């Protein structure tokens, strides 16, 4: 009997020891249901990483390709469009999967913030809503109405309408604006970043009043200013500048997205694969004195290369999401003719161009598009 009692006590001691070991906080991975306040910082930066990297190179180039702004040698832009838009092709399916993968990460973060307490984590809460709005703007502008997932689910869900998606985006951006703080770092989401994205969203929806209100608020805040030296924004030795509202840092230790590698040829100082080039139509839109031209289009050998991502194969360049130059254009279009002409001309003068001669709403819109 004594032997059995001793054995039982030994088993209990082992079980108790195992229990203590199993109670140790996990260090390498954790399920969404097990997330606590201790995980918020890691989750937050995980979301930043997913948002920067998941779209992939073609995700960032999507609208330039589909709009005919860039093309491949010996191809017409329409050929690129037809090849890119194959329904079952990876260019389409990879983006769809990537955006919903990003959404999964954001929803996990939001659930964790709500569990830990929103008031104590308002900035992270605001960042998550900003990113969810960005994801749905990417989705709705590519596919129209898509399923709105406020929480993660493995169930099959129906597509929501385009109108529902835009309403959701507006709601998300307002939550972001209400909870974020003013910018101190262009690589972190801020109240101004949310206002800039909201201005773009309302312009897309045709709500010119709200778009103009948000754009004018940013312009008149005095926090941002147009850069006379365009190379400070996109040049080889780009620096912190007065124009950028929010950008993805694209740190080489965390990303494989190197847009410059796609745009520069191997003869370039930082090398490149030279897959895509600006079309001559786009190059012709630059005026002779346009200060953007020598930064945006760089000659390498006999090739005209896209110059905004000078890292080539050597390093990743920041990807700008919002800058005050865009906000001037949003304001000009939203205010319309004639009120928007001055905002457009302020931007044109800073880029070395003469004032627009637009004399109607249609001409102003055309000038904005150029």
Where are these predicted regions, by residue range?
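Sec-dependent bacterial lipoprotein signal peptides
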Residues: 1-16
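Long, intrinsically disordered, low-complexity segments
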Residues: 18, 99, 168, 249, ...
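Membrane-proximal, proline-rich intrinsically disordered regions
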Residues: 18-60, 215
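Short, surface-exposed recognition loops and adjoining beta-strand edges that mediate ligand/DNA contacts
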Residues: 28-34, 58-75, 146, 150, ...
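Conserved, well-structured interaction surfaces
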Residues: 41, 45, 76-143, 155, ...
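Hydrophobic-face positions in mid-chain alpha helices that act as interaction patches
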Residues: 71-81, 215-320
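Structural register within alpha-helical repeat arrays
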Residues: 125, 132, 198, 324, ...
């Amino acid at each position: 009997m004594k032997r059995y009692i001793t054995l039982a006590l030994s088993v209990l001691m082992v079980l108790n020891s195992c229990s203590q070991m199993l109670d140790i906080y996990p260090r390498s991975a954790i399920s969404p249901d097990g997330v606590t306040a201790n995980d918020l910082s890691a989750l937050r930066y995980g979301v930043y990483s997913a948002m920067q990297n998941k779209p992939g190179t073609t995700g960032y180039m999507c609208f330039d390709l589909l709009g005919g702004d860039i093309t491949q040698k010996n191809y017409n832009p329409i050929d690129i469009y037809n090849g890119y838009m194959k329904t079952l092709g990876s260019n389409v399916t990879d983006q769809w999967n990537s955006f919903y993968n990003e959404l999964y990460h954001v929803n996990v973060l939001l659930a964790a913030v709500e569990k830990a307490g929103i008031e104590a984590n308002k900035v992270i809460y605001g960042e998550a809503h900003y990113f969810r709005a960005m994801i749905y703007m990417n989705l709705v502008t590519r596919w129209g109405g898509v399923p709105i997932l406020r929480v993660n689910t493995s169930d099959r869900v129906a597509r929501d309408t385009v109108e529902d998606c835009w309403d959701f985006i507006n709601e998300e951006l307002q939550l972001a604006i209400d909870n974020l703080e003013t910018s101190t770092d262009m690589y972190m989401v801020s109240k101004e970043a949310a206002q800039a994205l909201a201005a773009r969203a309302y312009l897309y929806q045709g709500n010119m009043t709200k778009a103009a209100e948000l754009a004018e608020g940013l312009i008149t805040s005095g926090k941002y200013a147009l850069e006379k030296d365009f190379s400070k924004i996109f040049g080889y030795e780009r620096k912190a500048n007065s124009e950028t509202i929010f950008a993805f840092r694209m740190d080489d230790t965390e990303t494989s997205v190197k847009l410059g590698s796609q745009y520069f040829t191997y003869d370039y100082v930082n090398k490149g694969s030279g897959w895509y080039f600006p079309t001559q139509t786009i190059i012709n839109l630059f005026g002779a004195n346009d200060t953007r031209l020598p930064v945006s289009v760089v000659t390498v050998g006999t090739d005209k290369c896209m110059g905004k991502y000078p890292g080539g194969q050597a390093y990743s360049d920041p990807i700008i999401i919002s800058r005050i130059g865009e906000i001037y254009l949003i304001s000009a279009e939203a205010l319309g003719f004639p009120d928007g002409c001055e905002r457009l001309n302020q931007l044109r003068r800073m880029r070395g161009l003469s004032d627009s001669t637009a004399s109607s709403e249609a001409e102003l819109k055309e000038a904005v598009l150029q």
